[in-house]
Amino acid sequence: MRKTNLHLGDFTEKSHNKVVPRYYGEALFRLAERNEKIVALCADLAPPTETDFFRDRYPDRFFMMGIAEANMVGVASGMARMGDVPFVHSFCVFLTRRAYDQVAMQVAYPKSNVKLIGFLPGLTTLLGVSHQAIDDIALMRALPNMCVIEPCGPEQIDSAVNAAMDYDGPVYLRLNRAETELSSDTKIKKLDIGKVEITRKGDDLVIFACGLMLRKAESAAQILSESGIETTVVNVHTIKPIDDQKICELVSHCGATITAENHSIIGGLGDAVSKALNEKNISIAVNRVGIKDSFAEGGSTPYLLNKYGLETQDIVNKALKVLKQKIKVN
């Protein structure tokens, strides 16, 4: 964690009056048009979770449950047993910490076909420690039967929602809301559960990233390329079940690796990659860019990412360090 200069803008919500794109809400709406079994539950957060589209069009399939996440998850489990496909919405931290026992006992254990949709992952909220989900991936990874997905950005949300729907069982979908419209030349990304996506190829180093850290990993790879270091960048959108076979193959080829995540380095992507390598007896240290063993503080996302070492330059610095210790695996 580094010292940073504080500015008023770092503690001010700049998008209060801004029209924010609603890629998730539109994707859920389109899905609901085709499948009448889909129902939506919300913990008094319809606009922030983009479920107001669904509420206004399908009021008889929308259930506002109040700020009672544990009860909401229990209700969703019962609805799933009756044949509905519940999409359950709140902020990541509330779905995971507050309702964890219900998620474990009423969703994961019976393999209920419930889709848990969490917003405000990691350091993407200025509301401080009570709203920052820095351990949600760790909590959900630990649950048997739970699928954990984090799309890289708005260009992958539609595919992520459809993949979650098609998955037979519980899914935790970790979403960061888009702040701007996608440009017309943005390539829409497909999401195949359990399969990584290689976005850049190189022989010197491999960076595994998820969520908003993918773009920072790609920017870091470009900077490294200018110094003659060619990097493979991998979008690990499915953290569980993870694509261990491809991960091991890529690391064995490059011999040096970094993970980058908007999450604690404990229990998240870094641990998942380490586990995959360890089980194949690949003896390479996984160098991690993420939140160290600490809580965060309030502030804007750029301020927090800089303070806690999750910026592009942090990935570059970590890459230069790990390359000095590179081991080629045969």
What are these regions (language model features)?
Residues 1-174, 179, 190, ...:
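Thiamine diphosphate
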